Amino acid sequence: MSYAYRQDLNWLVSDFKARVPDVAHAAVVSADGVPLSLSDDIPEFFAEQLAAITSGLASLMQGAARIFEAGLPTQALVEMMGGLMIIKAISDGSSLCVLASPDCDTELVSYEMSLLVEAAGEVLSPALRRGQERALPGRISRPGVSGRLG
């Protein structure tokens, strides 16, 4: 992923964490367990573990959906005594993982995650990236923000 697109994704994840109440951490992880974007305060050793867990659970979601012929999986919830782990699939095969407090408003967190998944899918889509690079050389795009680099 190019630097400009990584910056857009980091901005989206940081904005999500700052806006949504009771969210402790957020991460976008590739299908093969590589962290693509992390909220600011995730320690590096924890990031690798979180990415591996996220990709593993996402793979289990896909397997269950396939076995039960239930269509594409959209979300998984792991409820723990000290918090919630919510995972949503992103269109390119990557996943969004959010760790939130156990008493968070799960409907709000899930809704905001859906918005982030849609925006992240646009940033991560290879076809869209190629199209933007041809159409808008030297430009970056963020929701509600546009401008030239340099």
PLM-predicted stretches and their roles:
Residues 1-25, 32-150:
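Acidic, low-complexity cytosolic segments
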